Amino acid sequence: IRMNMATGAQQVFLTDGMASGSNAYCIYRDRKKRLWAASMDGANLFDAGQQKFSKIKLFKSLTIDIKEDPQGNVWFATQGGGLWRLDKNNVWKQYKHVENDSTSLVSDLVNCLVIGEKGQLYAATGDGLCEFLPSKGIFRRISIDAPSQDFTSLVISQGVMWISTSKGIVKYTPGEPVQLFNKYDGLTCNQFIPNAGLLASDGRIYFGSTRGFNCFYPYLVKINQVAPPVAITSVELFGQPIEAGSDQLEKSLSHASELNLSHNENTINISFAALSYVSPEKNQYAYKLEGVDKDWIYTHEHRANYTNLPAGTYTFLVKATNNDG
């Protein structure tokens, strides 16, 4: 739709062969003043002389985003057909995912394209994030430890990547721990829409979800840096709670430092909790029974189970992170 802002008059444009109900996902004007439209049936170029859009017949995949890089290449993100590039000499080239080739596009389902603060081309895909290296003509995967690799949108602000996913929003700063935000942090929901991210002129970031828009100032997003203490809340022997004052436990758990069991009392369950009450659903734990576990066991659960323990002396260790990890 083209609207005259002075009069409010509107004009609807369709591409050749496009049904009236077809979706358009993106409009982009490149440096050559060409006007492109990304639609359900591919990419379309506006013909100013004929006042209509013409379909690019080279590909028909659903096209969701269009961006131009500093070299004058126009990139088209498709959902299923990978990336198409139109260079400054009007030569087309397709980039697709190749199995077992780490230098290829990480997924053919591309949700969003972003030109970085130094001119880099990033592609957020259904299987993670990658960067195009123009000097080599290859892609480099950017490994981000997130609950979902379905990255729907990407916004870069002051060197920090904010990525919407199918399981919340990820804050990624190279060299620092990844931080996850979800509905427990105030988001409308955890499911976000492809190519629905925006960095506004006032610095606010917008992400579109299946339940409306979420917006925030990045500098106001504070990280909880207080490591929470952890309390042992219960110990069970063969599935039954051990009570204070019993043969096994002289004092209450909050005051006890040891548990005395006979050699045949060898199946125990230990429950614990982080004393952090800001979004406690996001607390994470690591525990280890010295003499049994060689390494820390990381979990979202707050319970450790041990069966058939040999006779001996053991030390149970547990630690936790808060809602911001």
Task: Specify the residue positions occupied by each region the protein language model found.
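Residue-level detector of Asp-centered blade-edge/turn motifs that repeat once per structural unit
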Residues: 29-33, 68-72, 115-118, 156-159, ...
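Conserved beta-propeller blade signature
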Residues: 1, 34-37, 73-76, 120-123, ...
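Glycine-centered loop/turn positions within well-structured domains
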Residues: 1, 11, 43-44, 51, ...
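Sequence-structural signature of mature extracellular/luminal beta-sheet repeat domains
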Residues: 1-6, 25, 29, 34-37, ...
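Surface-exposed loop/turn positions within WD40 beta-propeller blades
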Residues: 32, 40-41, 71, 80, ...
